[in-house]
Regions:
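Charged helix-capping and loop-helix junction motifs
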Residues: 98-100, 129-137
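Short, solvent-exposed loop/turn segments at secondary-structure junctions
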Residues: 122-126
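Long, charged amphipathic helices and adjacent flexible linkers at domain junctions
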Residues: 37-54
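Histidine/lysine/aspartate-rich catalytic loop segments that bind and position anionic ligands
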Residues: 55-109, 113
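A short amphipathic alpha-helix within small helical-bundle interaction modules
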Residues: 1-15
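Divalent-metal-activated hydrolytic enzyme cores
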Residues: 136-199
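Short beta-strands and strand-loop turn motifs
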Residues: 114-120
Length: 199
């Protein structure tokens, strides 16, 4: 297999037998594969039963490996995606977003639960303090309208990290309007046999 990279300035590296036209063709394969994955999920809805499935589902949407991008998967009670919502993009180590816009988009999707997802171009598959604080703010905002945040996954080019699996996703308590930091189930369902899903 030919491994192909770009230099920091975006120019293709010199690989014997690979000219500019071939380099462009190789890069187009990635875009075609991404489009195929997105269309496949739209035509054949799936239940996202765990963090790994969420990462596989959302990874094709991340189009720029050099900067952070932030998405939200809006789902129904059966954990079937209703919509993939683009939230924001930023610089290689930071992305800023509008909580009010995120809230409006979630409500408009008519979802009952969401999974948050962003990438770390640096390759560090871990949550920063800023990631944790942002997640808590989103849980508070969505909790007030009855939308549950199941997880916040972080993707790198070769790995992923689930905040829920590491006990970093608190629950919203509708009675008090506060966050509960006690341990919660990582994922609410893990059926033995996948259901036939109709959107």
């Amino acid at each position: 297999m030919i491994c192909f990279q770009e230099q920091k300035n975006g120019a293709p590296m010199q690989v014997q037998g690979i000219g500019p036209a071939s380099a462009r063709l190789l890069h187009s394969f990635r875009d075609v594969a991404r489009f195929y994955q997105i269309q496949k999920h739209k035509e054949h809805p799936v239940q996202l039963r765990n963090a790994e499935m969420c990462c596989e589902y959302i990874r094709p949407l991340f189009s720029d490996p050099k900067r952070e991008e932030f998405y939200m998967i809006a789902m129904n009670d059966d954990y079937v995606p209703l919509k993939e919502i683009y939230i924001a993009s930023g610089i290689p180590n930071r992305v800023q977003f509008d909580t009010h816009k995120l809230l409006r988009d979630a409500v408009a999707s008519q979802c009952t639960c969401v999974v948050l997802a962003h990438n770390h171009p640096s390759g560090l598959a871990a949550a920063s303090n800023a990631d944790l604080l942002a997640t808590q703010a989103i849980i508070l905002a969505l909790g007030q309208v009855g939308i549950d945040v199941l997880d916040h996954v972080i993707l790198t080019p070769t790995d992923w990290f689930s905040m829920a699996e590491h006990g970093r996703v608190p629950q919203y308590n509708p009675g008090t309007g506060q966050l509960l930091f006690a341990a919660r189930a990582t994922w609410p369902m893990e059926p033995e046999k996948p259901k036939q899903i109709k959107r």
